[in-house]
Amino acid sequence: MEEFGISPGQLVAVFWDKSSPEEALKKLVARLQELTGSEGQVFMENVTQLLQSSHKESSFDVILSGVVPGSTSLHSAEVLAEMARILRPGGCLFLKEPVETAEVNNDKMKTASKLCSALTLSGLVEIKELQREALSPEEVQSVQEHLGYHSDSLRSVRVTGKKPNFEVGSSSQLKLPNKKSSSVKPVVDPAAAKLWTLSANDMEDDSVDLIDSDELLDPEDLKRPDPASLKAPSCGEGKKRKACKNCTCGLAEELEREQSKAQSSQPKSACGNCYLGDAFRCANCPYLGMPAFKPGEQVLLSNSNLQDA
């Protein structure tokens, strides 16, 4: 028990599973209760119920899992992450698990290195392998019965990890050194400053060539362009004039004006019954002979209809 570093007043959690011998579990818990004393507490739970228990964050000082003699517990990534969550900052986790030493492809058994990597990914630090030994005959039988795994290259590994002295997501103010502003002005090279200085006397010097901005433009550049020349070459080409989607040459507005002008020139019904059909139309109705249409529907009349009307 000394390797667990348990002291009086601590809260210790012991996780077991169906492979843990009952008598060995009772003996372990009794010894832990002696170490924690009356001010401490030893909590026991089946590891398969850990994810459903909803323990409070940072609840235990020490967590022991799979350390019951004869136990062959396996720990998933979710279980390890939950153990790290309920462990207090600075608390320690001790677990024992059978691992595979041969190079085999399986998802059931982890190697010792993969087990340490899983502990690191769960948020623990200072991961150490404390012990590696061969499985006892009882543990080999337990692996075959409870895990359904057969291998001669299994070893029992005991590892430990520590939770950092801060919670995940916590923030801390950084103490940055105060940079004192210097009152001493930087030294300026006189030769360099002279290169960037242009006095009034230099402006009157005949050797200084100044460019007149007006001379940069030709007379052709100052002429206003013809609006027709600004239209895109392909805009409105063909028999049917059609403006581009993002027309900027004015063709869209021109077509809209032509359309509104054509609509205003169309004759309007005086009686309001033209859309019902010939039975309801006047003798001089321009829509005679045309089928009925919906109210408000646009109907274009040919020149012959207009002349007959």
Swiss-Prot record:
The keyword Mitochondrion applies. It is found in: Cytoplasm; Nucleus; Mitochondrion intermembrane space. Disruption phenotype: Death in late gestation due to defective definitive hematopoiesis in the fetal liver, possibly due to initiated apoptosis in erythroid cells during terminal maturation. One of its GO terms (molecular function) is 2 iron, 2 sulfur cluster binding. [2Fe-2S] cluster binds at residues 235, 244, 247, 249. The modification Phosphoserine is found at residues 182-183, 213, 269, 302, 304. Its cofactor is [2Fe-2S] cluster; [4Fe-4S] cluster. Residues 271-285 are annotated as: Fe-S binding site B. InterPro entries: Anamorsin, Anamorsin_N_metazoan, CIAPIN1, SAM-dependent_MTases_sf. [4Fe-4S] cluster binds at residues 271, 274, 282, 285. One of its GO terms (cellular component) is nucleolus. It comes from the Eukaryota. It holds the Pfam family Anamorsin_N. Its main location: cytoplasm. Keywords: 2Fe-2S, 4Fe-4S, Apoptosis, Cytoplasm, Iron, Iron-sulfur, Metal-binding, Mitochondrion, Nucleus, Phosphoprotein. Residues 6-172 are annotated as: N-terminal SAM-like domain. Signal peptide: none annotated. Residues 173-222 are annotated as: Linker. Component of the cytosolic iron-sulfur (Fe-S) protein assembly (CIA) machinery required for the maturation of extramitochondrial Fe-S proteins. Part of an electron transfer chain functioning in an early step of cytosolic Fe-S biogenesis, facilitating the de novo assembly of a [4Fe-4S] cluster on the scaffold complex NUBP1-NUBP2. Electrons are transferred to CIAPIN1 from NADPH via the FAD- and FMN-containing protein NDOR1. Monomer. Interacts with NDOR1. Interacts with CHCHD4. 'Ana-mors-in' means 'anti-death molecule' in Latin. This is Anamorsin. The lineage of its organism: Eukaryota, Metazoa, Chordata, Craniata, Vertebrata.
